[in-house]
Amino acid sequence: MANRKYFGTDGVRGKVGAYPITPDFALKLGWAAGKVLSSQGSKMVLIGKDTRISGYMLESALEAGLAAAGLSAAFTGPMPTPAIAYLTRTFRAEAGIVISASHNPYYDNGIKFFSAKGTKLPDEIEEAIEAMLEQPMDCVESAELGKASRINDAAGRYIEFCKGTFPAHLGLEGYKIVIDCANGATYHIAPNVFRELGAEVIEIGTDPNGLNINEKCGATDVTALQAKVVETKADVGLAYDGDGDRIMMVDHLGNKVDGDQILFIIAREALRSGQLKGGVVGTLMSNMSLEIALKMLGVPFLRANVGDRYVLEKMLENDWTLGGENSGHIIIADKNTTGDGIVASLAVLAAMAQHKLSLNELASAVKLFPQVLINVRFAGGENPLESDAVKSVAAEVEKRLEGKGRILLRKSGTEPLIRVMVECQDAELAQQCAEEIAEAVKKIN
């Protein structure tokens, strides 16, 4: 990934109107991807997007580039990222493209690709696309140009897929569920999934206008969801991010249940039913309490680098089927090929219904250690993490923690940030240590 010019850990991403998230680059990217992907197969690429206003501009440019390379485009309209992964497989498309910046504000956007198998593109394919971007753009003969079409039943297909992951002998009758769709791609999907399974659904964050995606709502800000769950005396709250590949939950008392706790609930239920294959993959950011709780069940646990693509890579390396991040990316590989917020939340609801336990009771096995995360904007130049001054402060902090906690310093793969994380059973000590390291990073920056 270090030598990439455009592709980060989750495709190409940035501020709309600033290179490379511009219409001219999207046109060239569509063409370059089309040239690389057109060697065989259906000659058709699915294009989905979230609800950002810039999605219209970018999908048109991508379609024109693909057509010039001889590939046809099939538009799904606003659709969760995991839906595109699923639909790419079922339509036997050459590839799938998602126009989204996930949990970022509306003024950011991104373009990411799925292979014909519904997985992130291999590194060598992304590298080939980057190499093609350096070539002058051409156009196939008129008779070979791609066409554009629309898939009108994409939402219905994905709704049925999601419902099919829920055990047939269970239902959600009697459950009151608040669903926050972040004014994003799940707004017309998630409420219907849970209603059709029998639940009473209360919606928030389901009125997208192109500018309000992830704005004080969704998986990155569950404050409104917590208030609505308590106000309506709901059994559970579900919060998805803008493109629907993350899930955060809220119990009936208004407590947040994060990705680590969700991952544990799903793992324990899979273990009980004999469906857990191998162990569980987390990340360097996974809370120590998750690892301890899984160890008590005898479940192996491995840490991958941060990013769902790295979680999936380690799952595939070990032939395991469950992994995720504390941010709410949960991959259940025997159900979908990427993080799927709706499918993951259905797995938790199935455990609640099966054992007649509340989310609070299910999540109580994982008592999260306080974790302090400080993001320091990185302007370029020397990487502060390579600085002797930062290394010295980090080493002193590690010594002070004396096995009671841990630190993690990393450069973001999707944003110009240095992430400082300190985890410790003593919350005050964690905060103090994180601030000391962040201050050292700022001085270098």
From Swiss-Prot:
Transmembrane regions listed in the UniProt entry: none
| HAMAP family, sorted | GlmM_B (MF_01554_B)
Instruction: State where Mg(2+) binds.
Output: S102, D241, D243, D245
Q: How is it modified after translation?
A: Activated by phosphorylation.
**Where in this protein does the record say Phosphoserine is found?**
S102
What cofactors are annotated for this protein? Mg(2+)
Matches recorded under Pfam families:
PGM_PMM_I (PF02878), PGM_PMM_II (PF02879), PGM_PMM_III (PF02880), PGM_PMM_IV (PF00408)
UniProt keywords, alphabetically: Isomerase, Magnesium, Metal-binding, Phosphoprotein
GO molecular function terms here?
A: magnesium ion binding; phosphoglucosamine mutase activity; phosphomannomutase activity
Question: Under what name is this protein listed?
Answer: Phosphoglucosamine mutase
Q: Entry's InterPro entries?
A: A-D-PHexomutase_a/b/a-I, A-D-PHexomutase_a/b/a-I/II/III, A-D-PHexomutase_a/b/a-II, A-D-PHexomutase_a/b/a-III, A-D-PHexomutase_C, A-D-PHexomutase_C_sf, A-D-PHexomutase_CS, Alpha-D-phosphohexomutase_SF
Question: Which PROSITE patterns does this UniProt record tie to the protein?
Answer: PGM_PMM
Record note on cofactor: Binds 1 Mg(2+) ion per subunit.
User: Reaction catalysed by this chain?
Assistant: alpha-D-glucosamine 1-phosphate = D-glucosamine 6-phosphate
> In which family does this protein belong, per the annotation?
Belongs to the phosphohexose mutase family.
Q: Which residues constitute the catalytic centre?
A: S102
Please report the organism this UniProt entry assigns to the protein. Answer: Haemophilus influenzae (strain PittEE)
Organism domain of life: Bacteria
What biological function has been recorded for the protein in this entry? Catalyzes the conversion of glucosamine-6-phosphate to glucosamine-1-phosphate.
Q: Which GO terms describe its cellular component?
A: cytosol
Q: Which NCBIfam families match?
A: glmM, PRK10887.1
PANTHER family from the xrefs? PHOSPHOGLUCOMUTASE (ALPHA-D-GLUCOSE-1,6-BISPHOSPHATE-DEPENDENT), PHOSPHOHEXOSE MUTASE
The answer on whether this UniProt entry bears the keyword Membrane reads: no
